[in-house]
Amino acid sequence: MFDRSLASFLLPAQILMAKLLAISSFWKAAGMTRFSTLFQKPKPVIAMVHLGALPGSPLYDAAAGLEGLLSAARADLMALQAAGIDAVMFGNENDRPYEFQVDPASTATAAYVIGQLRAEITVPFGVNMLWDPRASVALGAATGAAFIREIFTGTYASDMGFWAPDAGDAMRYRDRLGRSDMLMLFNISAEFAHSLDQRSLPDRARSAVFSSIPDAVLVSGQITGEAAALSDLEAVKAILPDTPVLANTGVKHETVADVLRVADGCIVGSSLKRDGD
């Protein structure tokens, strides 16, 4: 016999689950659509423009000053665009030691450099201020970036200490700044760090997509320039067939074909530079 009391409990739960699954499917499809709409081609290659060490960093070259930073960034940008790269991303990889809260002077200087180059950028561009989601959002909003990259989810033990970024805060901050159109690329395997989450990388990726609605998921190696394991890319892509999955580190000319056989794109930095610098 039909148990009305049980049904009154189960049916709302089933409806709620159906709604949650529908929302998840919507955001997966939206993420792939936003990603493909931005890049306009399959499997984009995004090249890094590594800014020189910025003011506030111990490695900043005060003698060369802002003009030195601008000149170096312009040279990299022009070379990459002339070579036919699909997109570029400006980042502060040289601001070592890294911080979880970037010096405002560094973010302001990055905005100045990108602003000076803005009219010369002919491809989609993104930004990343390591390892500060809010600074990355602010820089992206100020410069008109099409996308940002950061660690937005998870809990880590790292060279910089314990680390627990807040995706909800970063995404709401982006929207408050009027840039809900700016894509958020989630690095789910942080360099220089070890996840304290006992779940597998694919499970963490799937959870991040459901809970934090990224536009793409990035898989990294242990440090800058070290390749993500192809098996990790395969496992994450298998569990996220409807979400863009990119290789974030260590892609080289001799491996890019194998990487793009699995991944939906890649980010390339060191391997495009003379002596990796």
Spans of model-derived segments:
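Glycine-rich, proline-tolerant flexible connector loops at the mouths of alpha/beta enzymes
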Residues: 87-108, 155-158, 217-227, 276
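Hydrophobic faces of well-ordered beta-strands that scaffold small-molecule active sites
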Residues: 45-49, 90, 125-127, 149-150, ...
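N-terminal small/glycine-rich loop or linker at the start of catalytic domains
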Residues: 37-64, 177-192
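Glycine-rich anion/phosphate-binding loops
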Residues: 63-75, 129-132
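Catalytic cores of alpha/beta
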Residues: 132-143, 251-265
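Glycine-rich phosphate-binding active-site loops on the catalytic face of alpha/beta enzymes
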Residues: 146-160, 218-223, 263-277
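Conserved anion-binding
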Residues: 141-214
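Alpha-helix-loop-beta-strand connector modules within alpha/beta enzyme cores
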Residues: 100-126, 167-184, 228-247
